[in-house]
Structure formats: C-alpha cells, structure tokens
Amino acid sequence: MALKKYNPTTPGQRQLVMVDRSALYKGKPVKVLTEGKHSNGGRNNTGRITVRFRGGGHKKTYRIVDFKRTKVDVPAKVERLEYDPNRTAFIALIKYADGEQAYILAPQRLAVGDTVIAGAYVDVKPGNVMPLGNMPIGTIVHNVEMKIGKGGQIARSAGTYAQLVGRDHDYVIVRLNSGEQRLIHGRCTATIGAVSNPDHMNISIGKAGRTRWLGWRPHNRGVVMNPIDHPHGGGEGRTSGGRHPVTPWGKPTKGKKTRSNKSTNKFILISRHKRKK
C-alpha cells in the first residue's frame, strides 16, 4: 500500500504522511474474535509505573489473532484484510472449509479470495504455515515459533521477516532482521512471506496530538528535572547532565548490555551486535 500525503491546510497536516488504508475493510471486526481491553496507563498489577509516558489514547478492542495455526490440512479462504489498532501489521480474516473463522497476521501479497493452509508439506506461498525443517533454504518467513507449539514470536511487526539460511541436525539456522543468526528446532512452525504494511517505517506522525491518540504522553528529559527526580537533574542554567547518560534509577543507558538469559546463548550463532562492528 502506498503512502498518503495531505494538503498543508495546517502545520500538522503539512508534516503528516500516512499509509493509505483505503483497500482495507471498513466495517467492525468479527465480534466473537474480539475481547475488551483495559488501558493500564503503563501501570502493572500493583499500580506502579512500569512504562513511563503512557496513558490516554483512543479506546481499543482487542482482536484475537491466531499465532499458532494448529488447524492442520484444512484450507481457509481469505475473506478480508483489516486494520488492527493493537499492532503495526494488518490482519486477515480467514474462513476455514468447515466454517470456522480466525484472524491471522496478513503477509505481503496476500489478497482477498486467496486460499491458505497449514500442514507438514504445503506450497511455499504467502500465508501458508509449515515446520521450518520442511522448508527450502532461503525461504522468507514471519511469525516464527521459538518453542514447539508455543505460537509465533519472531517477526510479527509490520514489514518484518526472517530467512532460513541453513540446517544443523534437528535444527535450522534462521537469520533475523537484526542480523542475528539463531538455531530454532525444525519442528517449530513459521508462516511463509513477509509481514504486511512495510511502509509503516516511512510514516510521519505530523503533530504531538496524534501521538497522544496512540496512548503516548510527553517524554521529559532528565536534564530538565530537579535532582530529586533524575540523576541528570539540577544545576544552574542549562547543563548537559555532567555524567555519562543514565536512567532515572542510575543505570547506564545508551548501549550498555542488559541481556541475562545465558541459558539460550547456545542457540545464538551470530549476535546482532557482532554485525555492527
């Protein structure tokens, strides 16, 4: 889908660049495939802020998206493509041959009327699901499982994909968008194709108010705060913080490694950080 620009009737319209969503379905979602969703304003179950600068925003209905695709060898027809306010990608409503409906992540080049299917050995075409071990080397995939039967976790954002680059016994080697190469079990499934809406990276929000509609509040820098509020706060006049950048809790930021999951290090063949050196 193309990008859409607007006449400069206001400063916000002048800067605004949006994705043209005119080809998407304009009605309401299927009710049985939706749930109510409470806005938590960045607070956790104890009421403490866990994500700063969240709050407000338009009310959203959660669409239940099927990331597992466990209905094997039953063809499904794509009924329509829809906008989903809870994610950057578009979603597709599919209807199985037995009448059941489901939402899936819409891959690029998936059109209304196409047929998709999940199975051990299926055609390599967008929207079909099969185990990674049965795919040819070089296949572009998304919604990749990391644990057998858990459902897709990797490459679910707009325009993202991973690529199958090799095999190693029961495992396959997958290259991610970040440059990381990783071992994933061959029985883990993935959906063929890249995720829809690749132009999402090119949009321009246009004005502060549109960011508020998305549920983000103004982001305050530490150097404009008082010393009680942030390690960079205080000083007479404008200062640069006087130290290497830290979080509000005094931990180094801007590049310090925070990964602590050592048990899965053996599955990472090439780190995403190695690529940048």
Swiss-Prot record:
Q: Which UniProt keywords apply?
A: Ribonucleoprotein, Ribosomal protein, RNA-binding, rRNA-binding
GO BP terms: namely: cytoplasmic translation
Against InterPro entries, the record matches this protein to:
NA-bd_OB-fold (IPR012340), Rib_uL2_dom2 (IPR014722), Ribosomal_uL2 (IPR002171), Ribosomal_uL2_bac/org-type (IPR005880), Ribosomal_uL2_C (IPR022669), Ribosomal_uL2_CS (IPR022671), Ribosomal_uL2_dom3 (IPR014726), Ribosomal_uL2_RNA-bd_dom (IPR022666)
| GO function term, MF aspect, one | rRNA binding
The protein's matches in SMART domains, at most eight in alphabetical order, are given as: Ribosomal_L2 (SM01383), Ribosomal_L2_C (SM01382)
Could you tell me which Pfam families the record lists for this protein?
Ribosomal_L2 (PF00181), Ribosomal_L2_C (PF03947)
Q: Which family does it belong to?
A: Belongs to the universal ribosomal protein uL2 family.
What exactly does this protein do?
A: One of the primary rRNA binding proteins. Required for association of the 30S and 50S subunits to form the 70S ribosome, for tRNA binding and peptide bond formation. It has been suggested to have peptidyltransferase activity; this is somewhat controversial. Makes several contacts with the 16S rRNA in the 70S ribosome.
Name the UniProt record assigns to this protein:
Large ribosomal subunit protein uL2
Q: Which organism is it from?
A: Rhodopseudomonas palustris (strain BisA53)
* Gene name as annotated: rplB
